[in-house]
Amino acid sequence: ASEAVYHRLLADIEAASGTRLRILPDIIAGASAGGINGIFLAQAIETGQSLEPLTALWLDNADVDELLDPDARPARALTKFWATPLVWMAARRPGDAVERTVAPDTREEVRMKLSRFIRSRWFEPPFGGEIFSTMLLDAFDAMAATPAGPSLLPDGHPLDLFVTVTDFDGHVQSLSLNSPPQVIETEHRLSIGFRGRGGSASGFADPAELVFAARATASFPGAFPPFTVRELDRVLKRRHRAWPGRDAFLARVLPRRAARGEAEDAVLIDGSVLANAPFAQAIGALKNRPSRREVDRRFVYIDPKPGHRSIHLNREGEEEAAPIGENAPLPGFFRTIFGALSDIPREQPIRDNLEAIDRHSARIRRMGRIIQALRPGIEAEVEGAIGRMLFLDRPTPARLSAWRGKAQQRAAASAGFAFPAYAHLKLSGIVEDLAARLFQLSGEDAPMMREAYRQAIWKQVRAIGADQLTEDAGSAAAPVLFFRTHDLAFRIRRLRFLARRLAETLELEADADSEAVQAMHDAIYRALALYTECEGNDFYNDHVRAAAAQVPTDAGAALEAMAQARGLRARDEAADMLLAEALANLPKAGRRTMLLAYLGFPFSDIATLPLLQGDAVDEYDPIKVDRISPEDCTAIRAGGANATLKGIEFNNFGAFFSRVYRENDYLWGRLHGVERLLDIVISAIPAPTRLPEGALRNYRRAAFLAILDEEESRLPHVADLIAGLREEIG
C-alpha cells in the first residue's frame, strides 16, 4: 500500500538526518469541488473515518444520468426530437471530442448521455439540488458506517476548515468613513468555517452542517439550482433526520439574516464565483497555531488544470490561442458576458495572497537575523542583572520568578526612551485582542458595535491608569498589574522563543543528554498548552459570555471576568514548576543556554515586536508555498493536464459523461499527488542531510506501483491505462 511507502520514507529520513518528521494537515480551505474535497478530508482527519465512500461517490454517482433532476429529464424518446440530429452531428463528426478522447467501447455511452443531457430541460439547471444534497449526506453516512481509526491530529490540536460561498442577493454591511460617518454596501462573499480538535469527543460537526457547506460551495451556476436551507430541510425531513443545532448554525454562518428571521431566504451559489482560492482564510488561521515541535509550515494549493478556463466558448468548442495583432477581433457578445460575470472572477490569480505570505515570511527572516545579532549583548545584560549565581543555583519556581522579574526590569531600563513605545505597542495589542475576543463572545456582529467595544475597553484601561507607561514603573504600578493579569500573548511568545532556541541548539547536539533534552522539550510545550487553551472561544463559559454582552456599559466587569477565567497568575506558577524541574535536570551548559534564552526574551521582544507591528508570531519559520498540479509532475509522463486528464473536455464537465473519464482522472490525481507530496516531504529536510535524488526516484516508483496495485480492481474501465503506466514507470 502507498501508506507503507510514506512510513518507510519517514523512517529513512529519521535514520539519515535524526529528524522525526510528522505531517499534519491542520488548515484546509477550498471552494466549489475543492471545497467538497476539503470538507470530506477534514471530516476524515478529525474523526479517523475512511475516505473510501467519497471515492465511491465520485466514481459511481458523479454522472449526468445520476445528477439530472427528475423534472429535467427528457420524458420520452420524442422529447426535443428535433435536437437529436444536432446531437448526432456534433457527437459523430470525424475527429470530434468523443472520438478523440473516449475509448471505443464507451463512445456510445458518452453519446447517449450527451443526447439525454442536451434534450433535458433548457434555461433551467439540469442537475437536481436535492439529489446532490442526498448524495452528500449518503457519503457522510457511509463514512460513519465504516470502521474508524484514531484521529489523525494530536489531542487538542485544532483543525480549521473554510469553504467559500457566494450570497447571490448579498447582505448589507456598514462602513465607517469621515463623511458621511457611515455608508452601506452589499457584500456577496461568505466564508463558512468549522473548527475541530484532535481527540475531541464532541466530533467535528453535524453532517447536516457539512452537507450545507458542501452543497452551497459547489452550486455551480447553470448546472445546479442555487442552494437554500429549505432544500436541505426537505432532504432531512424525508429521511426523518433531526438537525438539533440548526438555528445556532444558521445564526453563525448567516448572522444578519438569522437575526431578522430570514436565514431560509438566503440564496447561495458556488463559492468560486468570487473567491476561487481562499488563501485569506487560511492565512488568518495561522494566528495562534499551537506548535508542539519545530514547524516547517507549508501552504499547499491544488490546481488540477492551470491555464484551462472553467468556461471557454469558441466556434469549434475547442481550446485555441487568443488572436493578437492589429486586426485581431474583439471578444464576442457572449464571450464578453461569460468572461465578465463568471470566468474572469473564477480564474483570478492568487498573486495578492502569495505576496502577503511572502511579506510575512520576510518579516520572520528579518526578525531571526536581528535576534541572532543581538544575542551576545542580551546574554551579557542578563548575567549583569542576575549575577554569577544564576548558573550556580539550582532553578526553583521561586528563583525562576525572581530572576524573570530582575531581567524584565533590566530590559526596561536598558531600552531607555524606546521602552514606552514598546510598552504602548504591547498594550495596544492586548487591548485590541481583548476587545475582539469579548466582541466575538458577545454574539454581536455589527461593525459599529465592534468599534463601541474597542472604545469601551480603551476607556476602562485609561480609567485604571494602565496606559501610564514608563521604564521605571514599579511592580505595583497599574500598567504592570494590567500586563500580569492580561498579557497572554507575551507569555506565549516567550515559550515559543524558548522552544525555538532548544530546537536550534540542544536538540541538534549529538552529545546532549537526550532524556533531559526531551524532558525540557516536553516541559516547554506542556507550559505552552497552559496558555494556548485560553485562545479559543470555546474555552470561555457562560459567565464570561454574559459579561461580554455588557461591555459597552460595564467594561470593567468584562475584563474582570476574562481575568478570572484565564487565571494567568496560577498558570504562571504551574509553568514555573514545569520549567524549573526541566532546567534543573539539564547538563550545566545546556541549562545556561536555556536560562539565557528564557530570561533574555524581554530584551529580544523589545527589539522585535515593533518590527512585527505588534503581531504575535507563533511559528518562527517562514511559510513556504507549494503547488500540486499535473504541470509539475513529469516523473511518469510529461505534458501536464492535456496529456493525462480527460475531464477537462466539454468545458471541464467531461467527467460527468463517462466513468472512464472519472476513473482516469482519479488515478492520475493519486499519482500526481503522491509524486508532489514526496517532493514536498523530502524538501523539509535540510540540504546537507537530505536523501539523494536516486532515493527519491525509488520512493516514487514504489509509490506509483503501490497505487496501481491498490486501484487495479476498483478501476476496471482503465485497465489498459494501468497496464501502460506499469510499462512507463518501469
Predicted feature residues:
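Patatin-like phospholipase
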Residues: 1-141, 175-178, 182-188
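Short helix-terminating capping/connector loops at secondary-structure junctions
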Residues: 17-24, 148-158, 261-262, 291-296, ...
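Catalytic or ion-translocation cores adjacent to nucleophile or general acid/base/metal-coordination motifs
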Residues: 51-69, 275-277, 284, 291-355, ...
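Non-catalytic, alpha-helical, charged scaffold/linker segments
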Residues: 62-77, 105-109, 334-574
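Acidic, Ser/Thr-rich low-complexity intrinsically disordered segments
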Residues: 81-88, 410, 415-418, 422-425, ...
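Active-site gating loop/helix substructures
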Residues: 112-123, 156-288, 332-335, 437-485, ...
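Long, C-terminal catalytic modules of enzymes
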Residues: 360-392, 645-681
